[in-house]
């Protein structure tokens, strides 16, 4: 597993990213973090990929249907990667320049995880694109057994009948863990209590803000 050579954003703000399987518990963590940070900071919560990609035919085909023969997965990966790059420069970076704290629900790491989990481990183009992607101040990866994640997804009324490729979920979990380790991320097991998980997130965020604030002034 190669490390992504992302660019430092060099702004007054802070970028924190949250990645993991659907049902890993990241939404609970980032929602609570946003609420706490807003007491003292300007906070902007965003999501990748954007709705422009999420509502596209190719994205919905891969998310909701077992038959993927209509598309080459690379085409979706390229679409998602370009969307993340554009979103970073047009949405995230201006917020960081203002000194805001940006929390991103998923980030470029998810693009890499999905590409590799589908068998494209030797595709180097994604590493080239990563050079233009801003490096987070802290990247959180939330790990949970696949069965637990799927059970959580199925408990949502709108997704109880959603198609889920179980084999893919196992591969994705492995990729997320590898990407986290290769890129200096923070790995948190959401099998632990919500309180323990959140305390780990908050502790790291507070450490980063404290250590970097003077350097950014």
Where are the regions that the model predicts?
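Walker A/P-loop
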Residues: 27
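Hydrophobic anchor at the beta1->P-loop junction of P-loop NTPases
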Residues: 18
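Post-Walker A helix-loop "phosphate-sensing" segment adjacent to the P-loop in P-loop NTPases
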Residues: 35-44
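A glycine- and Lys/Arg-enriched "phosphate-lid" helix/loop adjacent to the NTP-binding pocket
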Residues: 111-174
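NTP-dependent small-molecule kinase module
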Residues: 2-9, 32-34, 147-217
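Pre-Walker A (Motif I) flank of P-loop NTPase domains
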Residues: 11-15
């Amino acid at each position: 597993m190669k490390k992504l050579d992302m660019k430092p954003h060099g702004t007054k703000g802070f970028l924190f990213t949250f990645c993991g399987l659907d049902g890993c518990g990241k939404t609970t963590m980032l929602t609570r973090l946003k609420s706490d940070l807003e007491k003292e900071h300007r906070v902007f919560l965003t999501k990748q990929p954007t709705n422009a990609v999420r509502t596209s035919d190719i994205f919905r085909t891969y998310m909701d249907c077992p038959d993927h023969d209509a598309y080459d997965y690379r085409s979706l990966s390229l679409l998602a990667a370009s969307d993340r790059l554009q979103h970073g420069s047009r949405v995230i970076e201006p917020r960081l320049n203002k000194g805001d704290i940006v929390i991103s629900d998923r980030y470029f790491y998810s693009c890499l995880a999905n590409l590799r989990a589908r068998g494209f481990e030797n595709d180097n183009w994604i590493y080239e694109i990563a050079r233009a992607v801003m490096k987070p101040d802290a990247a959180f990866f939330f790990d949970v057994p696949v069965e637990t994640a799927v059970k959580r997804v199925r408990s949502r009324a709108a997704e109880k009948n959603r198609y889920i490729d179980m084999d893919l979920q196992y591969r994705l979990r492995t990729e997320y863990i590898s990407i986290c380790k290769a890129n200096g991320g923070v790995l948190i097991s959401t099998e632990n209590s919500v309180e323990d998980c959140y305390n780990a997130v908050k502790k790291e965020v507070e450490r980063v803000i404290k250590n970097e604030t003077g350097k950014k002034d």
